[in-house]
């Protein structure tokens, strides 16, 4: 429908195309109707410019035409020769490139109201970046569109920088970072895997907080695109439309617009940098082009901050079974045992401090302070870690007494209170000056106690147990409640960056409670921290949820998130399930709990031997380059076996198999994507050689027999160089 040289788009069409989602209607520039396909745009009389970003595996060509704006002209997987944009078939509304609303004005990359300022290329340590700089013709607003690629990865990572050149603040909403239409084939051939890339869904889909990695692909050719959003937590929204545009799948990666509506004010002369979005090209079943190789490798090397360089440390944590009843007498016994097991980091969880939000030591539990504890930890060859609540603090603390105005307020303007193991605590707003105080407190603890690892915990934006989100206070750094949501996530990143600026080697663990949802992990969290204490699986008894449910969490997330950033608590080392706990722990970032003092000397030595073996393997083989779930991985069950393989590109690595209560005797392990070659299998549990196998054996399946009472098998895979 035309009106005044523009096209009015219905609500259904608006939502369907992802153009300024849920704004009621959109005004699309008149050239959209005149030049409705990329072919027509490319052949128009406009004097345009094009730039290419890519490497030997991926290529993206972006074009700017004065009458039509910026759009992606070509997106190619050079490894598979797949072309994701077919010239002459992509409607321009499918290729907006980006979009947002600024003070009521609808803005899109493919909008004639933007003019080109220029483009710059720069180099990264292992890649390149392209920055295309635009200026709005009517608003004093500049937008830089940044595209990055990395050596060896078929991925383009994109973000925006919005610069306010006005003398007053601007308000941004409905922010769509990536808006692109890709050609995968007929609509009835396309498939979609959601959440972390493991849950099949219909191809017309809205992704939310847990949709950290979506895989859209052609079910026949296997060609596809993985979408990895670094928008944090509940701010995340992804639109997939594979229904309504024949031959095209519309992908929109944006901040949320309804449940947790994004708003952001940008002050005069200030800039806002969006989260990044990665599009990773793949082909299922095609060797190293398969997402089970590509995504773990990309996520580990690019999205993780530093864990992938040397592998994660083995961490012991005191939370279970001691909770807040931890004291120095208990800790000294645990230190001795943890040292014997070969732990790298000894962490005291909640209970060491006098009050939440105050790093003064609880002298009732630790009468000599923590210095003797620290000395004992280091004497055993370990490093020290502590638990710290970030924004949940006691009202008796100096920071609360001096600055009660920094507290988060609810909708009735009352201070927000969260329930903790130490009773009700105030929730401070991370979108206020409190973030400076929080950063100073974390830095003080790191420097005072020589911390190598910090577990940052508890409520920030809101908790994982139903408390209302955000802050309604006036006078903070957010203009309203909606703006507080993303600003709080920004506040968390502010604290972690302050720490990294002074102590780049410290590992920061951002727990699921800090991020606001049970079992959550996403690339936004990894952009702010190193590790994610992802869950507290009960493992207090042999028949607890324990390792079986820990692996359920692992398998569902490992398809797109780096497993070595996942701390899946709370596996106990002192239970009779010692082999299962160890084998489960090596699937992710290994964290062990339990009363280690109860372990026999034989069990301690067993753990030390196995941990030593795994550390040696991890140093020699980059097993972060893949993750293959095995057996009944989609639903772990006592009635079926499950397992995983973690392999380097060389083929070296580890396979862990769990019999559970399955009545069978042999698990058939199929790894059709195993690199070509010959491989020796050795049982880590028994030391026995199981034989030498070739690629064809892995395709057919190799039967691994469990002995009568055996429930766990761990196999080392070693490539035989001929």
For each predicted feature, which ranges?
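Short Pro-Gly-centered flexible turn/kink motifs
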Residues: 264-283, 655, 710-718
């Amino acid at each position: 429908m035309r009106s005044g040289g523009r096209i009015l788009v219905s609500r259904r069409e608006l939502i369907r195309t992802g153009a300024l989602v849920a704004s009621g209607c959109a005004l699309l520039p008149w050239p959209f109707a005149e030049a409705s396909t990329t072919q027509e745009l490319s052949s128009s009389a406009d004097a345009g410019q094009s730039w290419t970003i890519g490497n030997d595996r991926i290529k993206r060509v972006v074009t700017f035409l004065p009458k039509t704006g910026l759009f992606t002209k070509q997106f190619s997987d050079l490894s598979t020769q797949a072309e994701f944009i077919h010239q002459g078939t992509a409607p321009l509304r499918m290729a907006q490139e980006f979009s947002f609303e600024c003070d009521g004005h609808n803005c899109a990359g493919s909008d004639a109201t933007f003019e080109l300022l220029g483009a710059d290329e720069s180099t990264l340590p292992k890649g390149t970046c392209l920055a295309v700089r635009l200026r709005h013709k009517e608003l004093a607003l500049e937008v830089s569109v940044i595209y990055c690629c990395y050596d060896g990865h078929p991925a383009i990572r994109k973000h925006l920088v919005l610069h306010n050149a006005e003398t007053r603040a601007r308000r941004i909403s409905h922010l769509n970072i990536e808006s692109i239409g890709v050609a995968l084939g007929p609509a009835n051939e396309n498939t979609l895997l959601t959440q972390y890339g493991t849950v099949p869904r219909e191809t017309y889909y809205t992704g939310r907080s847990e949709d950290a990695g979506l895989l859209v692909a052609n079910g026949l050719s296997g060609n596809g695109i993985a979408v990895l959003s670094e928008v944090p937590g509940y701010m995340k929204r992804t639109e997939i439309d594979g229904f309504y545009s024949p031959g095209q799948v519309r992908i929109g990666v944006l901040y949320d617009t309804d449940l947790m509506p994004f708003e952001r004010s940008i002050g005069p002369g200030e800039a806002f940098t969006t989260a990044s979005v990665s599009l990773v090209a793949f082909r299922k079943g095609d060797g190293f082009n398969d997402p089970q190789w590509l995504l773990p490798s990309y996520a580990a090397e690019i999205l993780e901050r530093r864990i992938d360089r040397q592998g994660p440390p083995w961490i012991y944590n005191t939370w279970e079974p001691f909770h807040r009843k931890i004291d120095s007498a208990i800790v000294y016994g645990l230190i001795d045992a943890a040292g014997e097991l070969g732990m790298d980091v000894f962490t005291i969880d909640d209970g060491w401090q006098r009050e939440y939000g105050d790093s003064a030591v609880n002298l009732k539990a630790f009468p000599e302070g923590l210095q003797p504890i620290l000395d004992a930890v280091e004497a055993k060859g370990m490093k020290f870690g502590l638990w710290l609540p970030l924004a949940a603090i006691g009202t008796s603390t100096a920071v609360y007494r001096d600055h009660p105005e920094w507290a988060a307020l609810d909708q009735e303007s009352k201070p927000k209170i969260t329930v903790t193991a130490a009773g009700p605590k105030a929730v401070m707003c991370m979108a206020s000056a409190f973030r400076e105080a929080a950063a100073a407190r974390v830095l003080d603890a790191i420097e005072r106690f020589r911390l190598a690892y910090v577990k940052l915990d508890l409520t920030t934006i809101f908790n994982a147990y139903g408390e209302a989100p955000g802050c309604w206070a006036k006078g903070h750094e957010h203009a309203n409640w909606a703006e507080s949501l993303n600003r709080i996530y920004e506040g968390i990143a502010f604290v972690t960056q302050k720490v990294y600026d002074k102590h780049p080697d410290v590992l920061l663990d951002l727990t699921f409670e800090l991020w606001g949802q049970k079992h959550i992990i996403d690339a936004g969290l990894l952009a702010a921290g190193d590790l994610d204490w992802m869950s507290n699986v009960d493992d207090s008894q042999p028949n607890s949820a324990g390792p079986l449910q820990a692996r359920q969490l692992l398998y569902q997330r490992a398809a797109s998130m780096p497993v070595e950033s996942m701390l899946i608590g709370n596996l106990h080392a002192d239970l009779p399930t010692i082999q299962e706990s160890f084998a489960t722990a090596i699937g992710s970032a290994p964290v062990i709990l339990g009363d280690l003092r109860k372990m026999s000397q034989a069990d301690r030595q067993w753990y030390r031997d196995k941990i030593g073996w795994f550390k040696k393997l991890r140093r020699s083989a980059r097993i972060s380059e893949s993750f293959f779930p095995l057996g009944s991985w989609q639903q772990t069950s006592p009635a079926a076996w499950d397992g995983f393989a973690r392999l380097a590109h060389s083929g070296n690595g580890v396979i862990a198999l769990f019999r559970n209560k399955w009545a069978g005797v042999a698990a058939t392990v199929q790894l059709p994507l195993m690199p070509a070659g010959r491989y020796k299998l050795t049982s880590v549990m028994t030391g026995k050689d199981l034989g030498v196998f070739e690629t064809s054996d892995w395709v057919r399946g190799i039967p691994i027999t469990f002995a009568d009472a055996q429930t766990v098998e761990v196999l080392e895979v070693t490539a035989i160089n001929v």
